[in-house]
Design a protein with these regions (language model features):
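Hydrophobic transmembrane alpha-helices of multi-pass small-molecule transporters
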Residues: 3-7, 48, 84, 110-117, ...
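Alpha-helical transmembrane segments of integral membrane proteins
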Residues: 43, 71-75, 101-105, 128, ...
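Membrane-interface helix-loop junctions in multi-pass transport and translocation proteins
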Residues: 97-100, 107-142, 154, 173-192
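Membrane-interface helix caps of multi-pass small-molecule transporters
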Residues: 19, 57, 92, 118-123, ...
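Membrane-proximal transmembrane or re-entrant/amphipathic helices at the cytosolic face
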Residues: 173-220
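Interhelical loop/hinge segments that connect adjacent transmembrane helices in multipass membrane
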Residues: 15, 19-31, 151-165, 211-216
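Alpha-helical transmembrane segments
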Residues: 89-97, 145-159
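Specific pore-lining/lateral-gate transmembrane helices of multi-pass inner-membrane transport
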Residues: 1-106
Length: 220
């Protein structure tokens, strides 16, 4: 189920790499990269919430024997978001021809992942594996960001991104910890929460007038 996020990040990688190098000579390229990062995070958060909110339904695509393992899904999906952000950040060292940094970050992240697996799996099982991926990708992402800001500074809209992450986290916690026994009411409640997040996106960064097809009706 968590592979939904992996597929999204993989699709993004295929589309984004030629886009980055095509924009590398434009004067506003850094602004475009910052916007791409912001919308990547926004839409992966939408995917995260959608999967987690409807996990009670999605779990039926796998066998019942695997249901206890579904608790790793949010951790693995968050790790995939980190990996996608890391990939998004990774172009700075390619653009300035210092690709050795990519090897450094990957080696550090991989070392953390392997070490956590070796040390923690015997005691905590597959949960340790999920947290190892989360931590390894997270560290590589942070290293790439902070070193990149010194080598090839890009002004990411951290305030706006932080608001989206905080809102998504709040909605996720509400969905998880508000007890609603009836599955139909629970799905309706979670759909409302997801709609609130989408409405926030539209209000802040994606006005209806900018959406193809819909904008025709608004203009009328």
């Amino acid at each position: 189920i968590a592979m939904v996020m992996a597929m999204l990040t993989q699709a993004f990688r295929y589309a984004y790499e030629p886009f980055v190098f095509g924009k590398s000579r434009d004067k506003d390229n850094k602004q475009v990269y910052a916007q791409a990062m912001k919308f990547f995070i926004i839409f992966t958060l939408v995917a995260f919430l959608a999967v987690m909110f409807y996990l009670d339904i999605l779990r039926y695509i796998i066998g019942r024997d695997y249901w206890p393992g579904l608790r790793v899904v949010p951790i693995v999906m968050a790790a995939e978001i980190f990996m996608g952000i890391y990939f998004n950040l990774s172009f700075w060292y390619k653009l300035i021809d210092e690709t050795r940094w990519g090897a450094y970050f990957s080696l550090i992240g991989c070392t953390i992942l392997v070490a956590m697996n070796v040390l923690l799996i015997p005691k905590y099982g597959y949960m340790a594996c999920a947290w190892a991926g989360f931590t390894g990708y997270g560290v590589a992402m942070l290293l790439s960001y902070f070193v990149g800001q010194k080598k090839y500074p890009i002004r990411y809209d951290l305030k706006s991104i932080g608001c989206y992450v905080l809102l998504a986290a709040i909605l996720y916690v509400i969905a998880e910890y508000v007890p609603i026994g009836n599955i139909y009411l629970r799905m309706a409640f979670r759909t409302l929460l997801l709609s609130l997040f989408v409405a926030y996106i539209i209000k802040r960064d994606l006005p209806l007038s900018q959406i193809p097809v819909i904008n025709r009706f608004i203009r009328k």
